[in-house]
From Swiss-Prot, chains A, B:
ATP binds at residues 7-20, 101, 160, 185-186. It catalyses: cytidine(34) in elongator tRNA(Met) + acetate + ATP = N(4)-acetylcytidine(34) in elongator tRNA(Met) + AMP + diphosphate. This is tRNA(Met) cytidine acetate ligase. It holds the Pfam family HIGH_NTase1. GO terms for biological process: tRNA modification. Belongs to the TmcAL family. Catalyzes the formation of N(4)-acetylcytidine (ac(4)C) at the wobble position of elongator tRNA(Met), using acetate and ATP as substrates. First activates an acetate ion to form acetyladenylate (Ac-AMP) and then transfers the acetyl group to tRNA to form ac(4)C34. It comes from Anoxybacillus flavithermus (strain DSM 21510 / WK1). GO terms for molecular function: ATP binding; ligase activity, forming carbon-nitrogen bonds; tRNA binding. Its EC number is 6.3.4.-. Keywords: ATP-binding, Cytoplasm, Ligase, Nucleotide-binding, RNA-binding, tRNA processing, tRNA-binding. The keyword Transmembrane helix does not apply.
């Protein structure tokens, strides 16, 4: 059997994702589509609107054959580390291809640029540092430095282009046999916050925003299973998961933390801990808080990730230890259909990473220890006894079928 | 002017406390009654039902002339340290007497027993250790060891007797000129949980319990000002402060803490951190949680204090540094009437501790740093923008008149 990998967040799974899965299958004629999916928190440092289990169910219904977890130490990360983790898992699962959606739409410039980045790594790093020293934020500095070392075809200010570039770069660096592919995204702007009226495709950001107001508005932009899963979740748990819900916990935590302890938290650098401590006293919402902390130097995304690490109490030291090898240390399926199951059956005897269906066995793995803390922080907003039940779900849920 | 000191929690101020203030004034014929009052959390490790400012207002209306804060590092402590802190503040304020309520009711056995404890300190400590090693909890071990070194008149299993004993002992140890006095308590049982029907005096525990159900039931057991203050507080803040309200925060915190970090927390000893970590997963309420953690060795009170220290993130190291000298480092009035103001005016030029009316100036004091964290944890349960307002109150509230 032949497998293609995709890297996803499905926050939540919508018609654009459905299209991506269908196009991936068509373009690669793979037998099995494997999605590596962020767990409880996303790359941009936000709690996923519903837990990984619900999102995995949506993915299965949307045509994915196997959903595996991208654990927190890789998921809540810069694009570079996010890609390293995802590629290492797809590689461990013997995917022949990795197919990502991008603004650009053809693979050649990704390969060229990635090669340039790998072979002129030090030169590029040096340039990035120079720009950052000038007060330019990391994303911009990265693009400018890329231009300086001779690149001029790929627009890396586009969020999916930059992610795609990092997948290809990770493939090269990990000497993986995975062949990268790309398909053009049909949602023009990732950050769109209004729902389009003439189409049935909208960004996940706009869908999440509209879910806060009314479920009905989003029905046409998501497959039926997504709609139903979201409804059931809210009916059972009485909430979505969004930053505002976690704000009381973040505030409580920041208020009772010493500045020295904030400095230990992942991604905290250069005195931002003092800004955080000061702004939290007056902030009455997460949005207010981040607006007060924001400077030119820190992107909103970076600040959101820092807040996520504070919430989950994940330190620089822990993260560094966990991702030292730049690879995942286990593969954890969250959901699979018959095809997914058959594929796993076929490859598992050759796999060099443990295939984990019961998280209990991973208790002492540094990556899993972080993943577990993140799950525990994630369910903290649920009322009892739902919170306790959700906690036990992390250990007790076998991969969904 | 002549001042008498009392040590209180007023959680909340009730008719029994009113009687105590009146009797104290009568017995000592002091011009000024000074109450040292626990701040946000009590000696038994519970959040006070309303903030210190509200409780100070009740005290003033109940006849106290000056209310000063017993800061967290002394307030949330064993009886011994609680007494050391309180006596040091009353001593700094030149109180001539300290008058406490006790089950026993006459002062001689307190003085005798305290002297015994001071002069046979090492012998007593050694005996206590022996009993604790046998698995007996600290309170019992303390009483048994006291009996062993020759004491036989004071029943130290009574909570107010033991507190009183520690006041007298602290007076001796601190070589203070304060003269101790006691009056018999008229609430027979401190831990009573039902309201008496034939009287207008009930324990604070039973009053707190009944407040959860209905305000009306408690009206006859508290002065009018207490009743009104409680009503206004609940009307404004939509809540009382009790452990169950803080349980989501405690649970979140314990779940995301490493075992090593729990070991650093004040009063955590002998592997209790593993019991805490294990029990929290299944616990759906604070009461369930503590019941699951409880062993013979740990009293309920001790466990509650540990939970309070976890909630406020107060470590052994911080506490040790703060109370190294066994004395308070400042005197902070929370409320005063004209008599209280006149008294302060008279004594302040002779005081050796700073008199703090704006907490901002104490920012770098180790005791105040802990007090501040406790305030911040205490207000975390309030909805926004009330939480932010309450935080600013800590700095901005001048002593009430």
């Amino acid at each position: 059997m032949k497998a293609v990998g995709i890297v996803v967040e499905y926050n939540p799974f919508h018609n654009g994702h459905l299209y991506h899965v269908q196009q991936t299958r068509k373009k690669t004629s793979a037998d099995c589509v494997i999605a590596v999916m962020s767990s409880s928190f996303t790359q941009r440092g936000e709690p996923a609107i519903v837990p990984k289990w619900e999102r995995a169910r949506m993915a299965l219904a949307g045509g994915v054959d196997l959903v595996v977890e991208l654990p927190y130490p890789f998921a809540v990360q810069t694009a570079e580390w996010f890609a390293q983790g995802a590629v290492s898992i797809l590689d461990a699962l013997f995917c022949e291809q990795l197919c990502f959606g991008s603004e650009h739409g053809s693979i050649e410039p990704f390969i060229k640029t990635a090669q340039l980045l790998v072979y002129k790594k030090e030169q590029h790093n040096e340039k990035v540092k120079q720009y950052v020293r000038q007060g330019i934020n990391y994303a911009k500095a990265y693009a400018l430095a890329l231009y300086d070392i001779g690149h001029d075809t790929l627009d890396v200010s586009q969020p999916n282009n930059i992610l795609g570039l990092h997948y290809v770069k990770a493939i090269i660096e990990q000497r993986s046999n995975i062949k990268p592919e790309t398909i053009q995204r049909i949602v023009a702007h990732y950050h769109d916050e209004t729902l389009p009226v003439n189409d049935n495709i909208a960004s996940a950001t706009s869908i999440r925003r509209f879910l806060q107001v009314s479920d009905d508005d989003v029905a046409r932009y998501v497959p039926h299973t997504t709609y139903e899963t979201l409804q059931t979740y809210r009916h059972t748990y009485m909430t979505w998961h969004d930053w505002e819900k976690y704000f009381p916990f973040l505030k409580y935590r920041l208020l009772t933390m010493e500045v020295d302890d904030i400095q230990q938290i992942a991604e905290v650098e250069e005195g931002i801990e003092y800004r955080l401590k000061k702004a939290i006293i007056h902030a009455t919402s997460f949005h207010d808080f981040l607006s007060a902390v924001k400077t030119k130097r820190y992107t909103w995304t970076r600040l959101q990730r820092i807040c996520t690490h504070i919430l989950t109490n994940v330190t620089k030291k822990e993260i560094a230890k966990a991702i030292e090898s730049k690879r995942a240390t286990y593969v954890r399926p969250l959901a699979m259909n018959e095809t997914g199951r058959a594929y796993l059956q076929e490859v598992k005897k050759h796999m060099t990473l443990p295939l984990v269906t019961n998280a209990k066995h991973m208790r002492h793995d540094p990556i899993y220890q972080i993943e577990k803390k993140a799950t525990q922080a994630y369910v903290s907003i649920l009322p009892e006894p739902l919170c306790s039940e959700a906690l036990q779900r992390e250990y007790k849920t076998p991969p969904l079928r």
